[in-house]
Amino acid sequence: MKDNPISLFHELESYVRGSKDTLHRYMYACILEQRLADLLLLSRCGVHPDDEDRLAVRLASQRSLCVQAASDLAEGTEEARGSTPAWPDCKVTKSSAAQKRPELLSLVKVMQELRTPECSGYDLCDLEVCREDALHWLRDHADPSSPPVLIGVRTGGAFYAPLWSSALQQRWGNKALYHTVRALRMPSDPGASLYLPEELSILPAAIEPDTDIVILEDQPHTGGTVLELAGRLSAKYRLNKPVWVSSPGRLFQIENGRLAKCSDRIPLNTGTRKRIWQMLGNSEEVAEFLLPKLGLTDAHPADLEAVPYKSVPQWNDPMYRREVPFRINPKKTPFYIRRKSTNEPVVFAKFIGKDLFGDFQFHQLKKFEKYFPDILAYQDGYVMTKYEPGLKEMREMFVNMPSAVTREICQSVSGYWKTLLDSCQISGGHPVHPLADHWQARLGEMEDFIGRKLPYDLDWFERSLHTEWTSSAHVYTSLPYANQYGHWKARLSAGQRLKTYRFHIDSTWGGTSSIEVELASFLLENRVRPDDFRLLVNQVKKEAGSLTIEAVTDALPIACVLQAANLLKQAKDESRLSKELILSEAMQSFEYLQAMKPKLSDVR
């Protein structure tokens, strides 16, 4: 998994180097701690060549840096101190990990991704409250004579544990250390958590009988992740007292194999001004706050209102903390700013994450400005763009427009993948696409849902889904969540000037994908003709030397299964797509693929 010099992670390192923001530096330090801890785990499992002792020393040093950065953050230090450590490369591929230790596949996948923790994406908190959580635990729930063993569960817990350690060092100095462990997924049961003995053995060999253990984790859902870890720790240390669990603002104890809530408070800093996502539901407040930032010189506050793109569920309001599970989740709450007098939308606002993750995402997004409406502002994790009325779906244009127009579309959108390769490339991608294991089950579920058999070539799909993409360029992208044709639009002006748009470029909730699958998804969703297929692939090939038309053709069935999986998801979530719409879309896609298959031999 050797990192490309232009990889996403080196882009992140460069961005943080240019920032003096203490929160940016703190979160990057925690991301780096996770990277080093994962590398040490791979080394101890015999699949990474780096020296264990050297990695262990560097990891201990990095954790000290995390605690210092946590103290700076909690104390309100205005400007970050010290240098930004370099991003450590990794020389492990998924195929080599699979051959030696199949259970490490999920770890290598995690290491390819810039995962947004819940605290920055969809269970928002102000991180500094975690330090107050630790002091609250000391004051109201425990009076230990020795420092507790602090264990953060990577990913989320790695951002909380240093803040606890920083608080506890006020009493115990450098003895208040912390550790992190990675919860992996069992190959035989993806819903179950797995902690490897090679990592648990790094924890203290023994502890005093009255020592407390505190596990730091994102908000527990079922509690399965922390309950499994607590069980392993109880066996390791022969515990005679309950294990504590903390997520931002919350404290639990494990009693009789269950999580019992001890305290709960809204995890927001009361000294911080109100953010947009705290104003949701109050249209006038949102509009009045944003107007000075949007450059709408002809608008008056009384004539503007904020209108949810979707309904704003009450559980997004901090006052509804009693709801379970509770989240402050702006991911679900895009909105328009609209003129009351004309009902005309003028601004569209979408949340892309807060703190370092949102800020870096916005930094990346600006590289794609050519494919965006005009960006008016970025505030509190929301990107606000000029509302663009009258856009046409690109699919409609590929189907109905003359070849001169569709060729121009292909020329225009090819630059999107160039920018993606330049800014979001990762290394060591998937030898076989993740959908390969269960693709027939997914299509079977779709057939059951629509009550029809899908027309597809079983051999072609089986060969495609098990293609090894080891020589491909891989990117971190929004594709797994935003591959529908509705994300691609265009406008042809009266003077025949073409402007193309790609919506939902942000990969805050994204994943890894090969460039072949990226292109195949675009071609399938937009019903691209064979000649345009060839033109687009050859344009992108200029930036991705290993790309071939044959490989993109081989990826088309993957795009079809990916679309089916997303349609099924939308049938179940809040959007609740109708059965009739899903039937129409699925059948058209599979029929398009069947009709295209004999023509693709000419494209090759």
Curated annotation (Swiss-Prot):
Temperature remarks: Optimum temperature is 27-32 degrees Celsius.
Record pathway: Antibiotic biosynthesis; butirosin biosynthesis
Reactions the enzyme catalyzes: neamine + 5-phospho-alpha-D-ribose 1-diphosphate = 5''-phosphoribostamycin + diphosphate
UniProt cofactor(s): a divalent metal cation
Cofactor comment text: Divalent metal ion.
EC supergroup of this enzyme: transferase
Protein task: Catalyzes phosphoribosylation of neamine using 5-phosphoribosyl-1-diphosphate (PRPP) as a phosphoribosyl donor to generate 5''-phosphoribostamycin in the biosynthetic pathway of butirosin.
Name this polypeptide is given: Neamine phosphoribosyltransferase
Gene: btrL
